Amino acid sequence: MRKILFLLLLIACCTTACGPSKQNRKEAGEIYTTSLNLIKNINQHDSIYVNCVQYLMREIQTPSIQKNKKKLQNLSDSIALLENLNDSLIYIVEKSKTQLNDLQIDKSKYKLFKATDSIFNTYLNVANYEYKNINEKMKTISLPVKDSEYTILLKLSFKADSLLNSAIKYFNNESAEFYEKYGLKEIAK
């Protein structure tokens, strides 16, 4: 009987000792939640920029755009707004990077930091290159837009979308692994 109790006690100790400690799980939960919230905030700003670009892409194709002064003014205002939205996105990403670095100071051992930083860097690169190129192209297009100009805008949009989708896929894979590794499902309850 003593041997059975000893074996059960040994098995119980081994199974609880194999997983991450309570402190590690708590830290992992904080890192996971913070990362998701920072990315959500960045994504909201990015969506505002993308919605403005989509609106412009529809409107610049209107055949009689030159005759409608109000529509021309709206387009001009929206094109000017693109730069402000892009600058806002860059600011939010840089602010998020700072917040992540502050969180990482004493918790650098967690793998999710790398994936989160990677998605931040991708957003910064897209905002600094692809979005700025879109903004510059929008300023110089003829109205209604020529097919060649529209094709360039589509290529830039597609490139930005592809880069972001790749970074998001990488983050999603890493965060799912992180979530499972630290048993964050039980913490969320």
PLM features per residue range, with description:
Residues 1-4:
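Positively charged n-region of N-terminal signal peptides that target proteins for export
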Residues 18-84, 184-189:
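Immediate post-signal-peptide N-terminus of mature secreted/exported proteins
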Residues 32-38, 42, 49, 106-161:
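Long, amphipathic, charge-rich alpha-helical segments that form helical bundles/coiled-coils
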Residues 49-60, 89-101, 130-134, 171-172:
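Extended amphipathic alpha-helical scaffold segments
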Residues 74-86, 105, 109, 154-157:
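Second-shell loop/turn segments in exported
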Residues 164-187:
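C-terminal partner/receptor-binding element of secreted or periplasmic proteins
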